[in-house]
């Protein structure tokens, strides 16, 4: 073998070795050999070494080292830039991905141009850094360059930019520009609506997806079940249940099973929720939280506390903050005052979880339901952190129930300080206070507060209800006169009222 061929064989072996590095120690050793053999100036070889950083479990710790290797390259190519942007997207400094992209496009070399991979990794970095405005500029770039229509990963990334920024109207426009959206893109759009509490719109996307012949995956049905839970669409939830049973996803995917439990619990079928839960072959902390949340909604405090014992004994799962919140809520709805207080006091020692505002809100609510308003105020004043609006709101609700003007005024004052600028919350607090005044015949103060509401230009958000008929969820808003069959509706209500009065 000649000296030249031997030399090239050594280079080839070192480059292959760099691709097998799984620890930073191996990367450093290979880097040292690169320097010894003069490979550290070879762009191709260094690009392979940089790729090894993507396999490290603690990338953040070694990000500076990767950056220094990049800086040592005299003429980086597009693959090196792509790798560094990708490293940034997986680190705790995703914003630096934009820096490397700008270096790339400013490069004088004509052959260095961003590819579809560049934009894919850059969008991931922007999403992680919450650089949504930058993401929208990238959207313009990929449309102009023709990348948007040619690459599915870029399409999904751009769609996620608008979904994560909660610009759902724009997200829908982007989605409609995609020639043949796959199930992943349908999932992203549907999940965007559901995460914003727009369950009805999410279900419409799910139906449209089925009509277009797209086969749902596990994520699709999990999101759709969450939407059913939001709007009380029991009939549609049952249809999805039958669908996942045929697919055997309840046994294979714990999140599908958990979503079913949550859907039935929130749609008023706690017995069915329990039945589904008990048949789950795999359960996680979210499964238990869904069941306990269902028990809490029905005030089944004893059953909720029993779950707290079962979760560790049966599945070896340590309860988290959400599970304990569910148990506290169940205690509040069931009137289990001592059990709730004991749990709050022992949360840190027993479960290693420091109580948060929501846990204190539950206990304040529990004390108020029991008529212990002074004890509730004492607890608030002894909180280790400054009470948030949820805590004072719980006290205010108790003051209205028990007609306590003094504490009601205190709660409202704190709420107005905390919610300054939040029109809806300000209005809610002031309405509560005026109702307390009315309840104790202090009408002048009540009218004064109502005057403050009008003066601030606060308008009460009308109440609404959801009703599912034949799989269609309809929203009824208080005082709405826009329905085309309004006359028939009012006529029927009048007839029903007459019949009811005759029966009574």
From Swiss-Prot:
Disulfide bonds: none annotated. NCBIfam families: PPR (TIGR00756). Residues 471-501 are annotated as: Type E(+) motif. This is Pentatricopeptide repeat-containing protein At3g28660. It comes from the Eukaryota. PPR repeats lie at residues 77-107, 115-149, 151-181, 182-216, 217-251, 253-287, 288-319, 320-350, 356-390. It comes from Arabidopsis thaliana. Belongs to the PPR family. PCMP-E subfamily. GO terms for biological process: RNA modification. One of its GO terms (molecular function) is RNA binding. Residues 391-470 are annotated as: Type E motif. It holds the Pfam family PPR_1. InterPro entries: E_motif, Pentatricopeptide_rpt, PPR_At4g14850-like_plant, TPR-like_helical_dom_sf. Keywords: Repeat. The gene is PCMP-E80.
């Amino acid at each position: 073998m000649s000296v030249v061929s031997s030399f090239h064989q050594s280079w080839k072996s070192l480059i292959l070795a760099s691709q097998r590095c799984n620890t930073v120690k191996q990367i450093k050793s290979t880097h040292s050999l690169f320097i010894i053999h003069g490979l550290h100036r070879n762009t191709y070889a260094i690009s392979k070494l940089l790729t090894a950083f993507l396999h490290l479990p603690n990338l953040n710790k070694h990000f500076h080292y990767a950056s220094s290797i990049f800086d040592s390259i005299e003429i980086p190519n597009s693959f090196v830039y792509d790798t560094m942007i990708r490293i940034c997207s997986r680190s705790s400094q995703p914003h630096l991905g934009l820096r490397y992209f700008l270096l790339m496009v400013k490069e004088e070399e004509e052959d260095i141009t961003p590819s579809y991979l560049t934009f894919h990794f850059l969008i991931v970095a922007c999403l992680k850094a919450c650089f949504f405005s930058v993401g929208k500029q990238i959207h313009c770039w990929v449309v102009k360059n023709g990348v948007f229509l040619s690459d599915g990963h870029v399409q999904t990334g751009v769609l996620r930019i608008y979904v994560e920024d909660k610009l759902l109207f724009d997200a829908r426009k982007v989605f409609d520009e995609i020639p043949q959206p796959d199930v992943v893109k349908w999932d992203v759009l549907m999940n965007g609506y559901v995460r914003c509490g727009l369950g009805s719109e999410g279900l419409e996307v799910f139906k449209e997806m089925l009509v277009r012949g797209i086969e749902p995956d596990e994520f699709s049905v999990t999101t759709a079940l969450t939407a059913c839970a939001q709007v009380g669409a029991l009939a549609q939830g049952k249809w999805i249940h039958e669908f996942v049973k045929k697919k055997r996803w309840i046994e294979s995917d714990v999140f599908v099973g958990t979503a079913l439990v949550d859907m039935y619990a929130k749609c008023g079928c706690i017995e069915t929720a329990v039945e589904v839960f008990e048949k789950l072959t795999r359960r996680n902390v979210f499964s238990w939280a869904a069941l306990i949340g269902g028990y809490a909604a029905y005030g089944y405090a004893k059953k909720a506390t029993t779950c707290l014992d079962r979760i560790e004994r049966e599945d070896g799962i340590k309860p988290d903050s959400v599970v304990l919140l569910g148990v506290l809520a169940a205690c509040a709805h069931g009137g289990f005052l001592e059990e709730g207080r004991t749990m709050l006091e022992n949360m840190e020692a027993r479960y290693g979880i420091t109580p948060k505002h929501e846990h204190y809100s539950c206990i304040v609510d529990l004390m108020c339901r029991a008529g212990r308003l002074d004890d509730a105020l004492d607890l608030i004043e002894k909180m280790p952190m400054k009470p948030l609006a949820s805590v004072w709101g719980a006290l205010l609700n108790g003051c209205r129930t028990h007609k306590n003007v003094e504490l009601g005024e205190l709660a409202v004052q704190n709420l107005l300080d905390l919610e300054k600028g939040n029109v809806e919350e300000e209005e809610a607090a002031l309405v509560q206070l005026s109702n307390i005044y009315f309840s104790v015949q202090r009408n002048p103060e009540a009218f004064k507060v109502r005057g403050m509401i009008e003066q601030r230009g606060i308008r009460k958000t009308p109440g609404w209800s959801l009703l599912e008929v034949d799989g269609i969820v309809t929203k009824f808003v208080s005082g709405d006169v826009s329905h085309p069959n309004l006359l028939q509706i009012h006529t029927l209500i009048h007839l029903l009222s007459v019949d009811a009065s005759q029966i009574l």
